[in-house]
A protein has these predicted regions:
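Mature N-terminal segment immediately following signal peptide/propeptide cleavage
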Residues: 22-29
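Single conserved hydrophobic/aromatic residue that forms the stacking wall/gate
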Residues: 1-9
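Short, cationic low-complexity segments
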Residues: 248-262, 343-348
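Extended hydrophobic
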Residues: 165, 216-232, 344-376
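Short Gly/aromatic-enriched secondary-structure transition segments
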Residues: 65-69, 179-186, 241-250
Length: 376
């Protein structure tokens, strides 16, 4: 299938898209967080995988997906996603890849595959999905498209799987101002459980201060300024669980739009690394997507011919992040399996207890990754 490069498939991110995407990001993070657990999700990865799958849905299944994905109709979302992903991956820092794997026993609808190519530049594969060989091809595809950060997404294939839609993202960026050895000091981090541990903290003066009743934070730009690392530290008297529960798309947008630029922040941030993997079905059900996971109610009649009760049997999401003095490497992969059947002291921010962080696209202020670090 050839992809037409024309702009008919694009709509530039505007306020309507930003509101939908930030609300999806906040809900996904909030509904997936469980008390005290270090968590990392990539709203961009999950949104892309689900936006891709909704092109095969109809009826109430489609309506629920549209609502959960921020309330845009699917044609508009396809156009926004095309423009947004092209825009994000224009530099070297971020790579986004999509693929559709169809079991050799079924015929995927041409119109669905064409949309996957036109709007998501997806690679299309057809293979016996439950074979070990295909599982290993899928894992190598994910490993390659996350620069090796996520070596595998599935252990073995579900015998009932008729299609797998996979999104992979790799982010690798250096800080605009890297840390020197003299910027590193050993400080104590108090984890969610209260245990204390000495670890390497990176110290710097930043000049974008974030404040939101009950939390303080900062943004630290990566080289070229396209992306930034943002961290939010709830005040001592604010419980991190309550803070996360209070997040919303509007609140996220507001934190960034009211960022105080050129206001010095004395930052101390631990080096950290996190790997996370989750089966997202329960989270997505909390977000109102129900029929897609129910073999009786699911309507994926635009996905495959002879649609015999196709439903979503798995939504695997894996993420990885590493933040050190050089910069940040992060990756995410989402697999949707369709089964049938100058006064630095003014604003000190020391991330020495659980904190929320994001990798943000500075043009739209949308989080590509959002996580909470509860231990080091």
């Amino acid at each position: 299938l050839s992809s037409a490069a024309s702009d008919v498939y694009k709509r530039q991110p505007d306020d309507e898209f930003k509101a939908a995407a930030s609300s999806f990001a906040a809900e996904l993070f909030k509904d997936n967080y469980s008390k005290g657990k270090t968590t990392l999700v990539s709203p961009l990865s999950v949104l892309t995988a689900l936006a891709l799958v909704q092109n095969g849905a109809e009826g109430e299944t489609l309506a629920q997906l549209e609502r959960a994905l921020g309330g845009l109709d699917r044609d508009a979302l396809n156009k926004y996603m095309r423009a947004y992903c092209d825009f994000l991956s224009a530099g070297d820092e971020l790579k986004i890849a999509n693929s559709v794997w169809t079991d050799s026993s079924v015929e995927a609808k041409q119109a669905f595959l064409q949309k996957a190519v036109d709007s998501y530049s997806a690679q299309i594969f057809s293979a016996p999905l439950s074979s070990k060989k295909t599982v290993s091809s899928i894992n190598s595809w994910v490993k390659k498209n996350t620069d090796g950060m996520i070596p595998k997404i599935i252990e073995n294939a579900d015998r009932d799987a008729v299609m797998m839609l996979i999104n992979a993202i790799a982010f690798d960026a250096k800080w605009e101002t890297p840390y020197k050895r003299s910027d590193i000091e050993k400080l104590e981090f108090t984890s969610y459980s209260g245990s204390k541990k000495k670890t390497d903290f990176m110290c710097s003066t930043e000049n974008i201060y974030l404040k939101d009743g009950g939390t303080v934070g900062f943004m630290k730009p990566y080289k070229n300024g396209r992306f930034a690392f943002a961290a939010l530290l709830p005040n001592e008297d604010v419980n991190i669980d309550d803070y996360i529960a209070s997040l919303s798309g509007e609140k996220l947008m507001k934190i960034f739009s009211s960022a105080k630029k050129n206001e010095e922040v004395d930052v101390k941030m631990p080096k950290f690394k996190a790997e996370y993997s989750t089966q997202l079905i329960d989270t997505l059900k909390k977000m109102g997507i129900e029929d897609a996971f129910d073999r009786k109610s699911a309507d994926f009649s635009s996905l495959i011919d002879k649609n015999d009760g196709a439903y979503i049997g798995t939504v695997m999401h894996k993420t990885f992040i590493e933040v050190d003095q050089e910069g940040t490497r992060a990756a995410a992969a989402t697999l949707v399996g369709i089964s049938k059947m100058s006064m630095p002291a003014i604003n000190p921010v020391c991330l020495n207890r659980p904190f929320v962080y994001m990798i943000v696209d500075t043009e739209t202020n949308l989080p590509l990754f959002i996580g909470v670090q509860t231990e080091i």
